[in-house]
Amino acid sequence: IMKIQNSSDRREITMKEILCFGDSNTYGLIPGTKKRYDRDTRWTGLIEQQLYGKGYRIIEEGLCGRTTVFEDELREGRKGAALLPTLLESHAPVDRVVLMLGTNDCKTFYNASAEVIGLGVERLVEQIRKADQNIRILLISPIQLGEGVWEPGYDPEFNEKSVEVSKGLKAVYQKVAEKYDCDFLAASDVAEPSKEDREHLNKEGHKKLAEAVLGVLAA
């Protein structure tokens, strides 16, 4: 609760917190670079613009390389399940969580199927439910990896199997959403990876995803 006080007015405003927990496509990585889109371009920022003045605040928690439950031995702190409970506590009370992870889980050194990645997502959903049964969850299956993402000049951490696994996430996540009574959105239905790196959203992709997410949040 935020208290605002001036010489003529004192009132309380209760802001609803929406935690967006994801990877580089929530962080807003610019395709083919190590730079970040500005807040006015990122899908999280676009949502915040539309919800401004309506009692909502967006908490951006996107991290490049983040997975659901897998440890990245090359980069520390990427295991989503290791951090999510802390974030839920530090930002409490959280009204909603928008959860979009799974792309990095498709990397070759995890060797995970879509079904196993789905179990990782279940773990995260269970963590949210444990923190607060009243938190409303929007589970988003990520965009698909582009064909040839493994080719020289792109991302060698993926291969052909990675692309196939990414294509299977939509159906798996939808079942998880039904099991745990989550809202569901398939990012692959509204956006696709950029031609620049075959992996990340471009400006148009961020715009399309923001519009789709807003549609679910407003329902």
Stretches with model-predicted labels:
Residues 54, 78-219:
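Alpha-helical cap/lid subdomain in secreted, periplasmic
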Residues 1-8, 131, 137:
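Short intrinsically disordered, low-complexity coil segments enriched in acidic
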Residues 4, 11-63, 69-74, 87-91, ...:
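Serine-esterase "nucleophile elbow" of acetyl-processing enzymes
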Residues 7-10, 103:
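Intrinsically disordered, low-complexity regulatory regions of eukaryotic regulatory proteins
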